């Protein structure tokens, strides 16, 4: 499955966040937050359903996964600001 978009976003602090998009490019945006062990490409398995439902899936890699920067001593509470920055970058 080829994603609609596959790129790297550079956060304000310089960290890289790899993300892919699947589904309907003009659909309602939904953040797909993969578990462990996995990566952003896990969202490819819901591409067909997302297209049918008119949903745009945005799937970022967590820190240290694939091409996303590793974050030393990261906490669960570090994830929401990362997702928020990505949403701002995508003008959501």
Regions found by a protein language model. Give the residues of each.
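An N-terminal hydrophobic leader/cap segment in hydrolases
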Residues: 1-8
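A general secondary-structure boundary signal
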Residues: 8, 20-26, 84, 88
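Conserved HGGG/HGGXW glycine-rich cap/lid loop of the alpha/beta-hydrolase fold
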Residues: 15-67
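Cap/lid segment of the alpha/beta-hydrolase catalytic domain
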Residues: 59, 63-81
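Conserved acidic catalytic loop of the alpha/beta-hydrolase fold
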Residues: 78-92
């Amino acid at each position: 499955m080829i994603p609609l978009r596959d790129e790297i976003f550079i956060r304000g602090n310089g960290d890289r966040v790899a993300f892919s998009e699947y589904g309907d490019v003009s659909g309602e945006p939904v953040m797909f937050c993969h578990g462990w062990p996995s990566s952003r490409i896990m969202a490819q398995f819901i591409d067909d359903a997302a297209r049918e439902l008119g949903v745009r899936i945005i799937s970022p890699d967590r820190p240290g996964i694939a091409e996303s920067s590793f974050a030393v001593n990261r906490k669960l509470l570090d994830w929401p600001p990362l997702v928020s920055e990505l949403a701002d970058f995508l003008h959501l």
